[in-house]
Amino acid sequence: MFSSQNNSYMMMMGGGGIGNINNNQFYSPIISTSAQSFNSIVEWKRDIIRQLNDRNQNQTNNYSEFMRIYTDLLKRERTLNDRTLLYEKEIVSLRNEKKTQQQPPSGSSKMDSSSSSSSSNRVSGMGSTIEEMEQKLFKLQEDLTNSYKRNADNASSILLLNDKNKDLQNELMSKEIEIERIRSTIQQDLDSIKRLEMVVIEKENVSQIIRDELSSLQTEFLHNESKVVKLEQENSSLVERWLRKKNEEASKMNEANDFYQKMVEQRDSTPAKAAVQLSESISNLVVKLPDANDVPIPIVLERGVFSSEAMLPSKAKKRWTGHNSEIYCMAFNSIGNLLATGGGDKCVKVWDVISGQQKSTLLGASQSIVSVSFSPNDESILGTSNDNSARLWNTELGRSRHTLTGHIGKVYTGKFINSNRVVTGSHDRTIKLWDLQKGYCTRTIFCFSSCNDLVILGGSGTHLASGHVDHSVRFWDSNAGEPTQVLSSIHEGQITSITNSPTNTNQILTNSRDHTLKIIDIRTFDTIRTFKDPEYRNGLNWTKASWSPDGRYIASGSIDGSICIWDATNGKTVKVLTKVHNNGSSVCCCSWSPLANIFISADKDKNIIQWE
């Protein structure tokens, strides 16, 4: 009975998925690890199977020797049982034979004495054999009992080991859960580290912006210090001259009073003599003006008369080097007598258009100036820079009034809404509106693409149009900060400039890297006219097109140094100006003055050309 229990226990152990015993090795009957099936399973299933096989290997190695011993004991038990049964059968047969011999039949008394004696001898020999067999049987029963005891001990050990294995499995599962939790915590910590690294990078960028601004302010401060010294010296000289002139005027006034008193006294006595003395005294009172070299007299430029028809340029009149590096932008003031240019030498230069002489240099930027514009009253100049800031200078004095910081990318464009408000567009995909009286940003508009240029629509400044790197023109309500219209397919290349029509407030002109210019009606958002020419190639991301003040012509510079001029009314090419700018030097900007009688262009090779 105990043997059958052990056999059923072995069947339970072998059939329950723990393992089978075969040639002293332990194998899992559940998981197949053949090469063909293993390679056909996806990677995550392979990992699970590999982990289960590792677990089975770890769990079976501890019991393989024990199971082998247990199997040997079972075999010995079966052998002993077979031998015991055999001996028991022999004993039974011997006992039966002995009983038969002890009770002979009735005819047996007639046997002879010799056969009786031989039978008794054989019975006595068999009795000794039976005793030996009984002793062996007793021994075998003892061995069998001991084997049962050992099997019972082994079974209890197996149960204990199973319990221990379950505990270890539970502990392993808890450890795996803990490991998974720790992994999740580590991943969260890594994500936090990445976020903190991004914050650190952002803070470093802000710090770099502040350092650049500090450097520019220090440069501006040193420049202003030298200007202050010069102005103080000039002021002292002017005060001295003013006092001297006041003293001279006072002395002349005293002489005039004395003369008047004398004339009153002599009026009645000798009228003729008094008239002669009066004429002599008046001639003595004539004040000789000081020489022009002694007293600086401000030069007032002749503004000229507005021409109803814009000049069509044909040849170069003047040519000069504008900057120490390539030129990026230029702008006229409202009456056309001043021209501001910005370049890669980090400064804005103001030029007298009539004489072609430089009037002032505006400093403070730490990188290239990429956009300039005059305020409506011409008192200020706005310049935007690649140092992520925009600056405002006083036109007459050349002093910096404001430094507008807040963008985190290059500021590509800036325009005046009025004398106290400006708007800037940046590579950081934002448009910012600024209050110049308070000196800070009043609104930030997120435009989802780098802004290359923008214009103000209408006089109120509430509506804007901007051109972007993603080939789109966007129209904005600055009060809401939301786009009112997006023209995403207006061009096939990025927009390089947007210009208001000087004669029609409902039209704007766009220029693009797809080598075309287009007039857009801002009421219907339709393209009215497209301008292109085989010789026109827009070669720069900041190429600015120009509209003549009378609205008749449109001009833009090409990558080969030529300038194309179109008729705005029919889109036909009127003229192509060549062989003036260096061949291969892109013309970055060209413009008519507001008086329509001057046309100026600039290129990457630092040249400024005035046409006639």
UniProtKB/Swiss-Prot annotation:
Region ranges (Disordered): 95-128
Repeat region (WD), residues: 322-361, 364-403, 406-444, 447-486, 490-530, 535-576, 582-611
Listed GO biological process terms: autophagosome assembly; autophagosome maturation; culmination involved in sorocarp development; macroautophagy; phagocytosis; pinocytosis; proteasome-mediated ubiquitin-dependent protein catabolic process; sorocarp development
SMART domains in the cross-refs: WD40
InterPro entries: ATG16, Autophagy-rel_prot_16_dom, G-protein_beta_WD-40_rep, WD40/YVTN_repeat-like_dom_sf, WD40_repeat_CS, WD40_repeat_dom_sf, WD40_rpt
Disulphide-bonded residues: none
GO cellular component: Atg12-Atg5-Atg16 complex; autophagosome membrane; extracellular matrix; phagophore assembly site membrane
GO MF entry, a single one: protein-membrane adaptor activity
Keyword terms of this UniProt record: Repeat, WD repeat
Ranges of biased composition (kind: Low complexity): 106-128
Pfam families: ATG16 (PF08614), WD40 (PF00400)
Gene3D superfamilies noted in UniProt: 1.20.5.170, YVTN repeat-like/Quinoprotein amine dehydrogenase
Domain of life: Eukaryota
Function noted in UniProt: Not known; disruption of the gene for tipD results in morphological defects.
UniProt similarity note: Belongs to the WD repeat tipD family.
Name of this chain's protein: Protein tipD
Species per Swiss-Prot/TrEMBL record: Dictyostelium discoideum
This protein's encoding gene: tipD
